[in-house]
């Protein structure tokens, strides 16, 4: 086994580095949970100028944690510096929706963030860059960032559906009294929005079909909306948005992308036209990770019930794309 001294250091950029999600995310990265426990990491923290003090405090705490794999921390408000040589990037920082703000305005305002970041990635990142967009509206933010990075394959940009995927597993595990690791072949199709479609059609637990174990009415009337609206539920109960679970899911996504997995996961990737979903949008699909790339699980039979929900997501994502057409 290689020692850390003989393995090249991976540079990881995190935007919105002073925020709550990053406060959970950065410790996991520094602990080797993305690239493995033998690979040193260098963290590059990007923040807006008025939040650099907060990022400095985060960096101080990271250093105080004395992670054996953590080689260096850069704190900057300059996107070109932040993405210089980056092997992985978590785009966490985004503009939240203001009270009474239309979704089109939210998309446009975030385009002003993710477009320039995409260009900085295009101009400065390493050839093997992997970009995970966490900041919402994540699917269309990923589209905007990718469009601004014409020299980077679109497949190197993803939007996070793993939180929705993990929420779906959690709801099933609670319902059936089983461990989360026992579930396989769950997928969340579409958009990271209330329209998303958490799908248990192919899911199994301990070799049994989940659809044989739960009532269809519970699935449609409770499970699907509960997963789709879990974020709002947490805000109502906690008074704050779900940050630690988002960070944990981001780690899951990037780890599986880098290290590979044959287990099904939900990842928002550029549509290839699979399952009748139009190209030109970033959409949650059933995937496995092989050789550092997500591959769509092909050949699944789609019922009319599924088709309607998948199509609703595709239409919503196409509408979002049209709203930011001038940024693409």
From Swiss-Prot:
It catalyses: (S)-malate + NAD(+) = oxaloacetate + NADH + H(+). It comes from the Bacteria. Its EC number is 1.1.1.37. NAD(+) binds at residues 16-22, 110, 117, 134-136. GO terms for molecular function: L-malate dehydrogenase (NAD+) activity. The active site is at residue 192. Substrate binds at residues 97, 103, 136, 167. The keyword Nucleotide-binding does not apply. The keyword NAD applies. Pfam families: Ldh_1_C (PF02866), Ldh_1_N (PF00056). GO terms for biological process: malate metabolic process; tricarboxylic acid cycle. Keywords: NAD, Oxidoreductase, Tricarboxylic acid cycle. NCBIfam families: MalateDH-SF1, PRK05442.1. Belongs to the LDH/MDH superfamily. MDH type 2 family. HAMAP family: Malate_dehydrog_2 (MF_01517). PANTHER family: MALATE DEHYDROGENASE. Catalyzes the reversible oxidation of malate to oxaloacetate. This is Malate dehydrogenase.
């Amino acid at each position: 086994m290689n020692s850390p001294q003989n393995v090249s250091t991976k540079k990881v950029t995190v935007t919105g580095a002073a925020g709550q999600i990053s406060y959970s995310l950065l410790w996991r990265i520094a602990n080797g949970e993305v690239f493995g426990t033998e690979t040193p990491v260098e963290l590059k923290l990007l923040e807006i100028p008025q939040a650099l003090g907060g990022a400095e405090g985060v960096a101080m705490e990271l250093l105080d944690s004395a992670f054996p794999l953590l080689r260096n921390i850069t704190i900057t408000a300059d996107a070109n510096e932040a993405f210089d040589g980056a092997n992985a990037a978590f785009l966490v920082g985004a503009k939240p929706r203001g009270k009474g703000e239309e979704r089109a305005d939210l998309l446009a305002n975030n385009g002003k963030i993710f477009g320039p970041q995409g260009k900085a990635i295009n101009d400065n990142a390493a050839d093997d860059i992997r970009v995970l967009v966490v900041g919402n509206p994540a699917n269309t933010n990923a589209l905007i960032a990718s469009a601004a990075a014409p020299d980077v394959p679109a497949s190197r940009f993803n939007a996070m559906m793993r939180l929705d995927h993990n929420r779906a597993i959690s709801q099933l595990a609670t319902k059936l009294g089983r461990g989360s690791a026992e579930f396989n072949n769950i997928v969340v199709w579409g958009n990271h929005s209330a329209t998303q479609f958490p799908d248990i059609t192919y899911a199994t637990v301990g070799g049994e079909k989940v659809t044989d174990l739960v009532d269809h009415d519970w699935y449609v009337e409770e499970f699907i909306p509960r997963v789709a609206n879990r974020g709002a539920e947490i805000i109502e109960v906690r008074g704050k948005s779900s940050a630690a679970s988002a960070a944990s899911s981001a780690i899951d996504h990037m780890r599986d992308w880098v290290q590979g997995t044959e287990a099904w996961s939900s990842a928002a990737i550029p549509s290839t036209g699979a399952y009748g979903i139009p190209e030109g949008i970033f959409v949650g699909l059933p995937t496995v990770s092989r050789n550092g790339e997500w591959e769509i699980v092909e050949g699944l039979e789609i019922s009319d019930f599924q088709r309607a929900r998948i199509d609703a997501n595709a239409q919503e994502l196409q509408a979002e794309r049209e709203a930011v057409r001038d940024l693409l």
